[in-house]
């Protein structure tokens, strides 16, 4: 794909986003504020014994999230261990214990990290009834938590932040399921396969034999992208022609990753009664995304070495049908959201090019972030930003009429610290414990030296931020990585959720402070610039030393 075609691809995605984010954002606001339940929803409420008109305090909301997620982990783990007895197992045996644990945690936490080859490990029943179901509900949980935080800003003197079961079911049935159905049909029209055929041996033109996999790919591909999940039906993920056959399906999948996260700021603005606030948040997200895409594209177009110079760009690990700009667009969006899907191999990027997906995740995946998690992550950073602004002018910080006191700033600060601790401690332990270090260096790391460090840092960054992409040169199916990354995924998902829901409860209980001449206007360009600065300084600089030891040093040495 040439440069002009790549630019047109980016422009088309931006244009469609501009057109759809407003109606979709308004739709989600009405959906989560509605007091009307459909007949199907009422039947589900009766089945699980939930009163949809009864709201929950933040601890009750949290308990529901944790209980539901725990059941999800147990069900997905059990299905993998019993796979040999399930229909459509394709003759595949039970999944080993370590990988079963890692995979169950991965899909329940919306990470979709895959330390296995899907087409050679998972039968169709596990794929559809286990993993695909979690693609829906894990995304719905993320949106529900974001909506709970928005209610915290919107409500006054309230002890409740909504009903988790209502938010979960509405997000699944009214939003994700209909969109996925339409999306799957479009993907099938674009050439993505959808069947229940097993492996087929065919004769190639060269006279040999090749095994061709089948499967219900389009139905899973739709929610994989819409829910910013990212787990592929095939090991090559969206680089596989059965998942992403053409340049336009690649652009369409980029749009799917962005459409809900970029519409949620509009939902936020509608629910707090000031759409300008949502526009400001979306502007921050868009600015960071454009800067990241530009940097990655330039690094890959100007790759050093004789092969990139001969090809005109760094084409290693990239599909010709997608090209440099299409690969950079997909990789940027996949790591700025929590998707983690790939249509090119991030481990094959140039040193500085490979740093960009890593840095995108280190920013906290807030531009626009995953479905739900991106919005609540950016709102936490907004709390930090107004606190910094308050310190600069000597006023009590407030955001949307809510006072940002000691409790709120402690919760926001702890939120910021969670993922850096998981990433840096996990990486350090991988090299500090002698037995683990020997296994990591001898078994897991494909590339020694600076790039080997980058592979491990990338793995923990991806797991702790619930992204799921990888520097695939790292063998992550060892006992250390399946366990350590599983723990990182759990803590990286649920500790921030605890803090966000506690923040939502604290804000909802407050009265609203009247706006005065000294109130910081949080819908103007000055605040947009401040929030961008806080996002970059508070999060990215935390990782500067480890980036200097890995991709930066590798880039300078190349």
UniProtKB/Swiss-Prot annotation:
GO terms for molecular function: P-type potassium transmembrane transporter activity; potassium ion binding. InterPro entries: KdpA. Keywords: Cell membrane, Ion transport, Membrane, Potassium, Potassium transport, Transmembrane, Transmembrane helix, Transport. The chain crosses the membrane at residues 1-21, 58-78, 85-105, 130-150, 179-199, 245-265, 279-299, 374-394, 416-436, 484-504, 527-547. It is found in: Cell membrane. Signal peptide: none annotated. It is a multi-pass membrane protein. One of its GO terms (cellular component) is plasma membrane. The system is composed of three essential subunits: KdpA, KdpB and KdpC. Belongs to the KdpA family. Part of the high-affinity ATP-driven potassium transport (or Kdp) system, which catalyzes the hydrolysis of ATP coupled with the electrogenic transport of potassium into the cytoplasm. This subunit binds the extracellular potassium ions and delivers the ions to the membrane domain of KdpB through an intramembrane tunnel. PANTHER family: POTASSIUM-TRANSPORTING ATPASE A CHAIN, POTASSIUM-TRANSPORTING ATPASE POTASSIUM-BINDING SUBUNIT. This is Potassium-transporting ATPase potassium-binding subunit. It comes from Clavibacter sepedonicus (Clavibacter michiganensis subsp. sepedonicus). The gene is kdpA.
